[in-house]
Amino acid sequence: MATVNQLVRKGRTKRTAKSSVPALEACPQKRGVCTRVYTTTPKKPNSALRKVARVRLTNSYEVASYIGGEGHNLQEHSVVLIRGGRVKDLPGVRYHVVRGAADTAGVDKRRQGRSKYGAKRPKKK
């Protein structure tokens, strides 16, 4: 326990919260270029082929970023926009590709939750 005199001299130090998305550098999104687009398998007990892109950001960080939705048009040298948000069953993947921004196409035939996948509103018949 600190004495009153010690507290007057030094004061209490605030504990700083560590960012879960350091590569964004306190920005909402960052632009980058895909260096590798690949699939990977999730941790147990899940089983799938998850689509992931290795992205080199404008601030020269290189991060793994998840490509959500069914199907995508990304390949090497595609320009993408990434946002924060980890994928729980993929270790080391702490970012998401924003669908419908830059070179990333939105998800075709998406009816629900369209804003999250860059899909336009379907035409009324």
From Swiss-Prot:
Residues 111-125 have a biased composition (Basic residues). GO terms for molecular function: rRNA binding; structural constituent of ribosome; tRNA binding. The modification 3-methylthioaspartic acid is found at D89. GO terms for biological process: translation. GO terms for cellular component: small ribosomal subunit. Keywords: Methylation, Ribonucleoprotein, Ribosomal protein, RNA-binding, rRNA-binding, tRNA-binding. Residues 1-23, 102-125 are annotated as: Disordered. CDD domains: Ribosomal_S12. InterPro entries: NA-bd_OB-fold, Ribosomal_uS12, Ribosomal_uS12_bac. With S4 and S5 plays an important role in translational accuracy. Interacts with and stabilizes bases of the 16S rRNA that are involved in tRNA selection in the A site and with the mRNA backbone. Located at the interface of the 30S and 50S subunits, it traverses the body of the 30S subunit contacting proteins on the other side and probably holding the rRNA structure together. The combined cluster of proteins S8, S12 and S17 appears to hold together the shoulder and platform of the 30S subunit. Part of the 30S ribosomal subunit. Contacts proteins S8 and S17. May interact with IF1 in the 30S initiation complex. Belongs to the universal ribosomal protein uS12 family. NCBIfam families: rpsL_bact (TIGR00981). This is Small ribosomal subunit protein uS12. It comes from Halorhodospira halophila (strain DSM 244 / SL1) (Ectothiorhodospira halophila (strain DSM 244 / SL1)).
